[in-house]
Amino acid sequence: MKLTKIVGLMGAFSSLALASGLNTNTNQSAAYLRNVARYATTEADAPYYNPAGTAFMTDGFHISLNSQAFWQSRNTYTESPLFGGEKKFRGKAQIPAMPSAMVTWHRGNLALSGYFGITGGGGALNYKDGFPSFDVAVAQIPGMLTQNGLETTDHEADISLTGTSYIFGFALGASYRIVDFASIYLGARFNYAYNHYEGELKNIKVNPKNEILGLDGSMVEAASTFNNIADYLAGKAGEAAGAAEQYAAAAEKYAAAGDKASAAQSKAAAEQYGAQAEELMVKSKTLEAVAAQVSDRELDVEQTGYGITPIAALAINYKRLSFGLRFEYNTSIEMENDTKVNQVGIDNYNDGVKSDNDIPASIYAGLTYSLLDNLRLSLGYGHWFDSKANLPGKQEKYADDTDEFLYGVEVDFLTRWTLSGGVQVTRYNLSDEYLSEMSIILDNTTFGFGLAFRATDWLKFNLGYFHSLYKDWEEDVEYGKNTYKRESRGVGVGIDLDI
């Protein structure tokens, strides 16, 4: 029984990042959902994807307002004799609204731009039925009791975990066209990080059967039952200790009277009762400890921190070719606990404790080429230097940087309509030590498609759909085998204004 250690795994809740890096959301606009390869764009969402490209916009204000909704599942299928086969543990996340706003002011060769968005995380991940390691720990109780002479065949418990993670980003910067076809950008993003972990392990019940103890095989509350049995054993230990003292006193009297045979018999009885008392007390203390382990436990911890990301970018816009390059420096974020309840005995969750939660440095490159006036092809690449960052729990030693590859196509038709689609391939390059039932970060391929409609010369609507398919991962564990599966889908709507 290592329930406190298991509850401590809550710290492994990874970012709820929806696209790309371990701690980064690159899905910042509805236009991105319909065409993921946007690192060379010069449209209204350029302040995030290609900030240097804002220098090639027309004079005036350019605004992009977006909202996205996502649905995720992170499921674990556990094969174990403890469950009599396979058991499914469901994790679900629903993000009803993920807003973002981007603004550019352009005049001459200069552009000032900024954006707000949820640049990491994005919602709450809920495990209503807990995790395999939680359930396995409870499932081991019947076997443990049976081995110690208390026949038990079943168990049940109320287990729930919820992890919430957000990184809110506010960025400002300026781009300048240094020559007709090239521009540079310098800026920074302020990041405010927020995590909230809530966990409950309650109402653990078992069905022990023992006539002497008055247990008939019905479900009973484990902690109170173990405490009652511990008290019963302690009482019996006291009786045995009392008998040992009486026989020891009798042995002394017989010895003083010269009755060696009776003295020897009394001494042997005293030793026997003394050993019995010691054994019963050990069992009583053990059950007290087990009762404490299976008693109701709660965890309620909020973590907050902030950091600043320096950003530099370059853009080239030459005839039918657009190119964008962006570098974001490593962002050091130190999270501090605000603990409401910590009944799990893990010091890392104590109030005021600090931990690392860096946003790794990253580099992005994009290329868009217009084959025809109404047909554009795009390519993109992103790289996150995960192994160089300070990640939660020193996980960087199990990470070998993330790579993403993006492909997109857009076709204009009927004057005001645009049809687009794209593919994003993400490879996290993580070792097995990084991955766990609470850190299901899996390589994936994402498909996005959608439409844009330019209602007027200054108003455009974007609609996109995003669907990620993840590679399954299997892990051999001491109690059997876990298979991890994940799926994500989302929709986005946006309005672009050119004033």
Which role does the model predict for each range below?
Residues 12, 56-58, 370:
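A generic structural signal for short, non-catalytic loop/turn and secondary-structure boundary residues
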Residues 40-49, 55-127, 134:
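Outer-membrane beta-barrel translocator/receptor signature
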Residues 20-37, 42, 98-100, 106-499:
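Outer-membrane beta-barrel porins/channels
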Residues 1-19:
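Gram-negative bacterial Sec-dependent N-terminal signal peptides
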